[in-house]
Design a protein with these regions (language model features):
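N-terminal beta1-alpha1-beta2 module of alpha/beta enzyme domains
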Residues: 1-92, 192-195
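Flexible, glycine-rich active-site loops centered on histidine and acidic residues
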Residues: 2-48, 105-173, 221-235, 244-246, ...
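Hydrophobic faces of well-ordered beta-strands that scaffold small-molecule active sites
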Residues: 3-9, 69-72, 95-101, 126-130, ...
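Short, acidic/polar
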Residues: 48-61, 81, 199-209, 266-268, ...
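Conserved, mostly hydrophobic/aromatic
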Residues: 62, 66, 88, 118, ...
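Acidic-and-aromatic substrate-binding clefts and catalytic sites of carbohydrate-active enzymes
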Residues: 72-81, 104-109, 223-229, 255, ...
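Alpha-helix-loop-beta-strand connector modules within alpha/beta enzyme cores
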Residues: 81-99, 154, 158, 239-241, ...
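Short, conserved secondary-structure transition motifs
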Residues: 249-261, 386-403
């Protein structure tokens, strides 16, 4: 079977390593600051290096390492992922850009025009990561006071309108959140491939909306049994509408030659964790974040307290923010856990590691080639001594084949 594997591009910048204090000092979107590696002051002057240069380097590295594309996250502190996708498309060849955005802050007709323009310009390399918002201060930053469940209703209506205008035929809509009369894409843009939709959310409202709209239901990593139950719920909702969604998981990875070396990396990063923050619940009304807190011990005495099953660690968010769960282990162990997730029903992965540039090469070269090896029931056939067709270069390997 074929598994789509994406990498994460750090829109806010990057840590030089997981062992550095919790600050962005490489490719920081906020510009130069003391201790920055890039941009930096050299010879008393700024070196001219920007966060976009760093993002382009990560995109090129992960494309050459065999990843299908990259996730462009969206936060109040970052530049707009739509604009960054357009810029980075010129730096890559086949690389897809998964643009994260909240439908509440963009009219669906304008989103359709932007999307079709990107599809036309890039040869169909746009992918949607639809996020409806987790509440709390980040949501208020946008001035958005729509309730949790209503945000998912708004997202569903947004996607209905976006699809309605996509084929170029006049489309009317009078809904609760959006209104349009006779809207349609112009002939030059109509008919482009509609972007694949990655849809996330753990609440009943999110699962229901995902069942109606998701090509891929996207979840953070959780204990595997809990992921299976979540996928079953999405699948049941989708079947009621005659749809069959696929499933994707976003995972941070620390993979090294040995398991001991991987945990040593975690131990060094753990030295910078705010222990008080480690015992505080997350703000906001995100059901997914609340689920994560349910797996975290009330009192944490050491980093190994957060290993919830072999090689599955829920302390990543304490070291550098973002999702809590990730995989820690040797290259073989991490590949085996990914294989187990494929057995569970996962069709796509969004992987990440700090620093994103070097780890793209490491994971692409050391982990991805191992996927499926533990699933073989017989030895793989030896390649011919004089193959008629040369092996495909990483640039052309956009899907990972799992045997």
């Amino acid at each position: 079977m074929t598994i789509d594997i994406y990498w994460r591009i750090g829109m806010e910048g990057d840590h030089a390593s997981l062992r550095t204090p919790r600050r962005y000092n490489r490719g920081h979107a906020g510009g130069y600051g003391p201790g920055n590696i890039a941009p930096a002051v050299r010879g008393g002057e700024l070196d001219g290096y920007s966060y976009l240069d760093h993002a382009a380097a990560v995109a090129r590295a992960s494309e050459s390492a065999g990843f299908l594309g990259g996730l462009l996250p969206s936060f109040p502190i970052t530049e707009d992922p739509w604009a960054v996708a357009a810029a980075l498309a010129r730096e890559t060849t086949t690389y897809r850009f998964m643009v994260a955005f909240q439908p509440g802050f963009l009219h669906p007709v304008q989103a359709a025009r932007m999307s079709a323009s990107l599809q036309r310009a890039t040869g169909g390399r746009l992918v949607y990561n639809i996020i409806s918002g987790g509440g709390g201060p980040a949501q208020l930053w946008w001035g958005d006071k729509v309730s949790h469940d209503d945000r998912y209703a708004r997202t569903s209506e947004f996607l209905d309108v976006l699809r309605g205008v996509w084929d170029g035929e006049p489309f009317d809509h009078a809904g609760r959140f959006f209104h349009t009369e006779g809207a349609a894409l112009p002939p030059a843009l109509a008919g482009q491939t509609f972007p694949e939709v990655y849809f996330s959310g753990s609440s009943p409202a999110a699962v229901q909306a995902a069942g109606c709209h998701a090509d891929y239901y996207l979840s953070w990593l959780e204990p595997f049994a809990d992921l299976r139950a979540k996928f079953d719920g999405v699948r049941a909702h989708a079947e009621r509408t005659g749809r069959t969604p696929k499933f994707a998981v976003r995972i941070d990875i620390v993979a090294r030659d040995t398991e001991e070396a991987a945990w040593a990396e975690i131990e060094q990063g753990w030295a910078f964790v705010d222990r008080a923050a480690a015992n505080r619940a997350a703000q906001g009304d995100s059901v997914g974040a609340a689920r994560i807190q349910g797996w975290v011990p009330e009192t944490i005495t050491g980093y190994r307290d957060l290993e919830v099953q072999p090689n599955v660690w829920c302390g990543f968010s304490l070291i550098r923010g973002g999702p809590a769960f990730g995989l820690v282990g040797s290259y073989e162990q991490v590949a085996q856990r990914l294989d187990e997730l494929v057995d569970l029903g996962v069709d796509a992965f969004i992987l990440a590691g700090n620093p994103h540039l070097e780890e793209a090469y490491r994971v692409g070269e050391e982990v991805l080639p191992l996927l499926g090896r533990s699933r073989l029931t017989r030895p793989a056939a030896a390649p011919p001594s004089n193959p008629a067709v040369p092996a495909a270069s990483p640039k052309t390997r956009i899907h990972q084949e799992i045997s």
